[in-house]
Amino acid sequence: MSVNNKQWYGLPLNLIWGYVAIAVFMTGDGFELAFLSHYIKALGFTPAQASFAFTLYGLAAALSAWVSGVVAEIITPRKAMLIGFVLWCVFHVLFLVFGLGRANYALILLFYGIRGLAYPLFLYSFIVAIIHNVRSDSSSSALGWFWAVYSVGIGVFGSYIPSFTIPHIGEMGTLWLALLFCATGGIIALVSMRHTETPRHMQNLTTREKFAELGRAATLLYTNRSILFSSIVRIINTLSLFGFAVIMPMMFVDELGFTTSEWLQVWAAFFFTTIFSNVFWGIVAEKMGWMKVIRWFGCIGMALSSLAFYYLPQHFGHNFAMALVPAIALGIFVAAFVPMAAVFPALEPNHKGAAISVYNLSAGLSNFLAPAIAVVLLPYFSTIGVVIAYTALYILAFFLCPLIRVEQPGFTSDQHAKPFTANAAES
């Protein structure tokens, strides 16, 4: 199949409405991210119980993310996104009505957990569409744009809009508003991706062959050592993103005296920064090398900015301007991991869907492990214990990066690759 050559600063123009759909859908999905843990606590539950709800959600998201790449190849990205879209809307309504509406912790866990299966199917299936419709040597910048629109949705609009709606319609009203955004994003995706192509050989596999391909999403972790190390680095990548969304509202609002709206604006500043840094690092990595950017700017940058996100607010107290400094730093350096999405399929060019599934599983496990670490450490070591744990893991990722041996299409690196031919780049 042919791939797209028309781009605008690395943005594939044939998929532009798919990018818009991701931004709109993730806006709705992101409404809850920075205030739901605090709201569950306000219903009468403990911080550990609030964190556990996010942990269960993250586990469901990890399982869904694991299968999404292969499922998208087998049934097409559009159909996989449809399943995720419908699942999200149905269980969001059940979560609001019977879970939060009745302050029933068991139903909160049940419906919120099941809803966790939805967004990875919608979000990560689009990565499959990108990989198969963009030239290999342009995939890093195209994926940089993917994470940029993700940040626009889940972080910027997903944080700023609630900061204005909560004072007027409250948390529950804001969560109902999220349904409108997700429905709109889902419809845009279904309409705009009617003619998006993916290789058809996967769709013609027998049932047994389909399950075998699905199983490869797990077996790659021990048949390809570079995939295993890449998976660990990808898990570590977004620990602070998902973890700070759970623990920092309690520190900023309950301890330092920030209002919920102020905290949401600090968190939105982090995501706003990633709009530009995702695109920036995606382009830079194609010139400098994927693994150099990930190691030196991603791992080291996140270790330092994670510490700053705790210590600067603790030192300056209720100071909105100073709280923005580590938020912006975090936004700059978390995006330096963007090339990881290109690394996985490059490591397994003949099984790109399975490789993307491992990438997605790793992203989902990050969503699961970040609050899980908080659940374990918060009762004993407070917020600082969680922050130090995240920092130590970023340092671990720094030492794992040299063990990942990837050939970057169109790029010559003494450390990691020999030159790729044009045919090899498209294999």
Curated annotation (Swiss-Prot):
Membrane topology of this protein: Multi-pass membrane protein
Transmembrane segments: 8-28, 52-72, 80-100, 108-128, 142-162, 172-192, 239-259, 264-284, 296-316, 324-344, 361-381, 384-404
Record's subcellular location: Cell membrane
Molecular function via GO: transmembrane transporter activity
Pfam families: MFS_1
PROSITE patterns per UniProt: MFS
Topology feature Cytoplasmic, residues: 1-7, 73-79, 129-141, 193-238, 285-295, 345-360, 405-427
Nuclease recorded as keyword: no
Keywords: Cell membrane, Membrane, Sugar transport, Transmembrane, Transmembrane helix, Transport
GO CC annotations on file: plasma membrane
InterPro entries from the UniProt entry: MFS, MFS_dom, MFS_trans_sf, Polyol_permease-like, Sugar_transport-like
Keyword match Membrane: yes
Coiled-coil stretches noted in the UniProt entry, renumbered to this chain: none
Topology Extracellular: residue spans: 29-51, 101-107, 163-171, 260-263, 317-323, 382-383
Membership in a protein family: Belongs to the major facilitator superfamily. Sugar transporter (TC 2.A.1.1) family. CsbX subfamily.
Name of the protein described by the UniProt record: Ribitol transporter
Organism: Klebsiella pneumoniae
